[in-house]
Amino acid sequence: MESRNEAYEGAYNATFWGDFSYHGYGFSEDGSKFCEQIPILVNSFGVWEKLDLPIRGMKIWDYSLPHLESVIVLVLCLWQFFYLSLKKIGLPVPKITSMMIAGAALSQTNLLPNDWTIQHILFPDDTRPKVPETLGGFAFVFYWFIEGVKMDVGMVRKTGTKVIVTGIATVILPIIAANMVFGKLRETGGKYLTGMEYRTILFMQSISAFTGISRLLRDLRINHSEFGRIVISTAMVADGTGFGVNLFALVAWMDWRVSALQGVGIIGYVIFMVWVVRPAMFWVIKRTPQERPVKECFIYIILILAFGGYYFLKEIHMFPAVGPFLLGLCVPHGPPLGSQLVEKFESFNTGILLPLFLFFSMLQIDGPWLANQIGQLRHFDGQLYEALTIIIVVFVAKIIFSMIPALLAKMPLTDSFVMALILSNKGIVELCYFLYGVESNVLHVKSFTIMATMILVSSTISPVLIHYLYDSSKRFISFQKRNLMSLKLGSELKFLVCIHKADHISGMINLLAQSFPLHESTISCYVIHLVELVGLDNPVFISHQMQKAEPGNRSYSNNVLIAFDNFKHYWKSISLELFTCISNPRYMHQEIYSLALDKQASFLMLPFHIIWSLDQTTVVSDDVMRRNANLNVLRQAPCSVGIFVHRQKLLSAQKSSPSFEVCAIFVGGKDDREALALGRQMMRNPNVNLTVLKLIPAKMDGMTTGWDQMLDSAEVKEVLRNNNNTVGQHSFVEYVEETVNDGSDTSTLLLSIANSFDLFVVGRSAGVGTDVVSALSEWTEFDELGVIGDLLVSQDFPRRGSVLVVQQQQNVACR
């Protein structure tokens, strides 16, 4: 017994016990034995550890949790530094590219001396658990699952023939061209790339990964344009074509037993997803009460299935990310399930965990070897030369064969080239595949160094080129005057009405019914229901037939459909069309621009972002995102815009009040003239009594002069001249002039008449720069309403009358 104890203590001496106590592991004196504490030490013993044992005590990042936190902070700060720096100098490099740059920047730190702190943090010894790398792998699986959830497979059914031809050509034809070149390269002595490496590089350069392209379009903010929709549809077709080519290659090049196993495995997995998992998800949605979240247990089951799919495809030797991606495709998009998954996990995964994966992936780049290969390029020799030959051939072929179908479809040359650039861009999808190739021993680390560098170059340069070649804002510039002033009397009046929430429906219907001559057949009304995009990757635009919606049907626009269907049923003479747009609030203005241009609308009505209770004393909803959407519309709308603030108890649209009192406040300027032009249109409704209140400052400083003053006078005279509709001795227009000294007088005057009118119409820029609003502008809370409009909706103002703030069309381009 004593001899055994002596042997034990001889093998494990005092040094070992010091290591074991603090490190959680230790080596015997001769280095032949290793002992580890289970479970491992996660946290340190505190700040006194190094003072207690200065030799044996660990550094704080030697423990798992502090080490993980150190790496997360380092990676976060580094990629944010690159992202913000590049953005500051005008280079719109995507966030994912910045994460890759951060990893590439520190990839050579493994060449530093071992006693450097950065070495201990980024390249720990093999005895320590790789917690950051493990979480990065977790993010890798999660990324593919979330991308599948956000993808709308239904878009494939809506693609046209030209899009399908472009998507197939941009994958198949570059592969054919590259095979021809590679054959010639082999004949002239190419010897560095193996056949499997060549096929892997060729395939990944030829495909157009939908998930990567969709993220690029989001980063460049062009996924909401018509051009963006075409590119997304083309990428979906190209991605499907690439998947088919991959399956064909597996059957042709691999052992038939392996191919059979993979074929049976993937078919069985798809059948299980479509016929078992997806119906189960619909069963979960059916059991979930409307407007309520899905139970957490179902969310966890789906996550387990995602990781199970990953490991299943890994076992049958297929790209494992396809497993969680296919599961994501099976998740019904939108609320409650799809949107809840995206809201719950995407931000954390993309912002915290995914940078770890990209960072550690790029750490594998061998910089010195790559520099040596670059030097060999002048001799037209080396592995880099062979790989670059394939990359350039496929890239050029992909650009050409992507542009030709687009040009034949009469797409502008610049747009065709930009689309080809987008389809040729490489990013996280390709990086994931090459990394999987290294882990599967299909690619050597040297080949991964080349391809990771090429992906980094592509994902850095392509977005910058696309940003400067394609200006999406130009797509929304009108070449004609689309405002009410330029509209001839008797011409068709085209409204575009925006609805954000169900609370806006009755207010907009009441405004239309009470204010405008709906009995005439010269009014067209286009209604767009704007729904926040959650749980989807790309916007959805739906054109509805005006048919009666079925109550109880769970639809995005069910309430809107029912309400406006009844509205059209009563006002049969009006032309009415309804649309639903599911979009990111930051880009909703682009959807509104597109529809306004397409329908040649003259006036666009937006609901105010604040909703009050019925007694007008409490704010029920204050949606900042909707406010930002309104502000974006005002900046570049292709027609005149009105922001409607509903502040009164609603009247029935079918039983109009005998008279509807409207006050048009006029100071001067183009917005006020547009407000008067709107008043002229309202005069065609026999139930409208219009009062034009002209505010004249005691001092004329800042007032319009010259041509603007003539236009102001002409518009007032036009309103009075058209006052020909009378019933007996009743006049429909009353013209009142009031002189005010300052903003205080204006406020007092408007307070005195607040309860006399049902609707106030005012220009957004009314009184700006004059004594009419002096001192009031300092208290303006909502810039989109202007100074007087903001006063009319303030807390101190009586809340009987609604307010319509008008802005005339801002931008008219010259051909």
From Swiss-Prot:
Keywords: Antiport, Ion transport, Membrane, Potassium, Potassium transport, Transmembrane, Transmembrane helix, Transport
Localization per Swiss-Prot or TrEMBL: Membrane
Highest rank taxon of the organism: Eukaryota
Membrane topology: Multi-pass membrane protein
GO MF entries: antiporter activity
Transmembrane segments: 71-91, 136-156, 163-183, 198-217, 230-250, 265-285, 298-318, 351-371, 388-408, 417-437, 450-470
Location (main, coarse): membrane
Cited Gene3D superfamilies: 1.20.1530.20
GO CC annotations, alphabetized: membrane
A single BP term in Gene Ontology: proton transmembrane transport
Pfam family, one: CHX17_C
Role played: May operate as a cation/H(+) antiporter.
Family, per entry: Belongs to the monovalent cation:proton antiporter 2 (CPA2) transporter (TC 2.A.37) family. CHX (TC 2.A.37.4) subfamily.
Name the UniProt record assigns to this protein: Cation/H(+) antiporter 5
